[in-house]
């Protein structure tokens, strides 16, 4: 009997080390950043079983077999639609400003579609203004309303949006809503989905959280886009979730969330539409394409207006696209660079680009929240401040709530607004959306918003920062080491 237990023990030990060796080899063979690989190896060797389970669940990008098959099947029809769109050459910009030309060229070559002109943009800096405009657009909608959000939380002014959508559906408008399962978990636990479906609104739970399928699809892959489309000619996108900030996370101790949305009329709504259709088909298996270009685009052909490129990122889209776009933007800066983000955990390449910009004389400012709703990200962000301050970057800590806006302004001309945080999850993992605007007028509007943020912020003093308690430095470095996993 003792021999049997001895054999079993040796088999368990052998299997244990074989499993660790196998996962280690898998990490080393995957093409990933060295800091990320080292962080995962550290977790696995310090907490072997926990680390292995965590890596198999969250360490690799698994879209899921069914979604991957749908993505493969939908591409031919999507490619055909894009070819038809490109036949309308008059809507595409042929010239860009000097600071924007490299980025627009990158986007066109990698995504296959150039930036479109003739768009009218309106920046909205408050939740109330956004909802007021949205309710008016929903009331005037005649054909279709599509929405995708990470978080939809009933209550406050959101109830008016729900009622307006129900009214639209009852008068024959096709309404489709795609909501992330994890972000909108409270919504799906309440009666609102059934209420909306009864009225004829299609409500779909995207990327459902299922622990039993954790090894088949990455559970922390999230649908982080925020897009509203109305009659395929009006679009909204930005950082705002469908939540009333007066009611959302009031117990987090960070104040109300501050967001930025853009309302757009013009051909870029068509570009956003095809992205929404891809997300819809990937989640439901149902094909849904925007109206033909000759119906949808022609009314907006004009020489005036804003030139916009759309960057869609996430599984199934050009790899590292948003990361490359941010790097290109930073390296294009010659005079000024202002970046706003709630979560700042940049890649080594992005951090180096930002520091290099400051060191070559660019006026670089980064605006982040003073208090963060994520303790882990908050500490990890602080770990980068010393290097940024040493390079001459100005760091502003917003003190009037949780600044949730995601924006980049380069030389007052090139603007990036959307859903992308300057952290690893947005750069490498989640489904995100970004508008790239080449327009000095819009840049001036965005600069005014950023100046308002700065006026409500505290400039981080380099000397005071160097004198912070030693225990804080230890905590910062600890989270810095694990920042590739956040």
UniProtKB/Swiss-Prot annotation:
Record field: catalytic activity: 2 a 1,2-diacyl-sn-glycero-3-phospho-(1'-sn-glycerol) = a cardiolipin + glycerol
Keyword Cell cycle in annotation: no
Keyword terms of this UniProt record: Cell inner membrane, Cell membrane, Lipid biosynthesis, Lipid metabolism, Membrane, Phospholipid biosynthesis, Phospholipid metabolism, Repeat, Transferase, Transmembrane, Transmembrane helix
Record function comment: Catalyzes the reversible phosphatidyl group transfer from one phosphatidylglycerol molecule to another to form cardiolipin (CL) (diphosphatidylglycerol) and glycerol.
Enzyme active site: 224, 226, 231, 404, 406, 411
Species of provenance: Pectobacterium atrosepticum (strain SCRI 1043 / ATCC BAA-672)
Enzyme Commission number, as recorded: 2.7.8.-
Listed name of the protein: Cardiolipin synthase A
Disulphide-bonded residues: none
GO molecular function, one term: cardiolipin synthase activity
Gene name linked to the record: clsA
């Amino acid at each position: 009997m003792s021999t049997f237990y001895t054999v079993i023990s040796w088999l368990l030990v052998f299997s244990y080390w074989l499993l660790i060796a196998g996962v280690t080899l898998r990490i080393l063979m995957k093409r990933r950043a060295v800091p990320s690989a080292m962080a995962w190896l550290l977790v696995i060797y310090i907490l072997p079983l926990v680390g292995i389970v965590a890596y198999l669940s969250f360490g690799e990008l698994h879209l899921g077999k069914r979604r991957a098959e749908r993505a493969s099947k939908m591409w031919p029809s999507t490619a055909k639609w894009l070819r038809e769109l490109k036949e309308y050459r008059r809507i595409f910009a042929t010239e860009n400003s000097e600071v924007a030309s490299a980025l627009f060229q990158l986007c066109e070559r990698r995504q296959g579609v150039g930036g479109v002109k003739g768009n009218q943009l309106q920046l909205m800096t408050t939740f109330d203004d956004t909802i007021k405009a949205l309710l008016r657009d929903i009331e005037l909608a005649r054909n279709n309303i599509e929405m995708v959000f990470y978080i939809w939380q009933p209550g406050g002014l959101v109830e008016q949006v729900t009622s307006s959508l129900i009214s639209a559906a009852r008068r024959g408008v096709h309404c489709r809503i795609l909501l992330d399962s994890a972000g909108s978990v409270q919504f799906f636990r309440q009666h609102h989905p059934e209420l909306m479906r009864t009225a004829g609104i299609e409500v779909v739970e995207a990327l459902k959280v299922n622990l039993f399928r954790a090894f088949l699809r990455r559970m922390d892959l999230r649908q982080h886009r925020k897009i509203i489309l109305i009659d395929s000619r009006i679009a909204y996108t930005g950082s705002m979730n469908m939540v009333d900030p007066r009611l959302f996370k009031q117990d987090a101790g960070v104040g109300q969330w501050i967001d930025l949305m853009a309302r757009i009329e013009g051909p870029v709504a068509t570009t956003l539409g095809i992205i929404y259709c891809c997300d819809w088909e990937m989640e439901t298996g149902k094909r849904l394409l925007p109206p033909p270009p000759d119906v949808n685009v022609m009314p907006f052909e004009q020489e005036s207006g804003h030139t916009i490129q759309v960057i869609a990122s996430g599984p199934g889209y050009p790899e590292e696209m948003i990361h490359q776009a941010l790097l290109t933007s930073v390296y294009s800066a010659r005079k000024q660079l202002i970046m706003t983000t709630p979560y700042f955990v940049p890649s080594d390449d992005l951090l180096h680009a930002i520091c290099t910009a400051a060191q070559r004389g660019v006026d670089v400012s980064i605006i982040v929240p003073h208090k963060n709703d994520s303790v882990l990200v908050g500490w990890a962000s602080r770990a980068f401040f010393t290097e940024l301050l040493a390079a001459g970057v100005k760091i502003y800590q917003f003190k009037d709530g949780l600044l949730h806006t995601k924006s980049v302004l380069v030389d007052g001309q090139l603007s990036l607004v959307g859903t992308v945080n300057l952290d690893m999850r947005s750069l490498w993992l989640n489904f995100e959306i970004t508008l790239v605007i080449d327009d000095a007028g819009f840049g001036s509007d965005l600069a005014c918003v950023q100046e308002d943020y700065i006026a409500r912020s505290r400039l981080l003093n380099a000397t005071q920062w160097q004198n912070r308690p030693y225990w804080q430095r230890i905590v910062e470095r600890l989270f810095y080491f694990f920042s590739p996993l956040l």
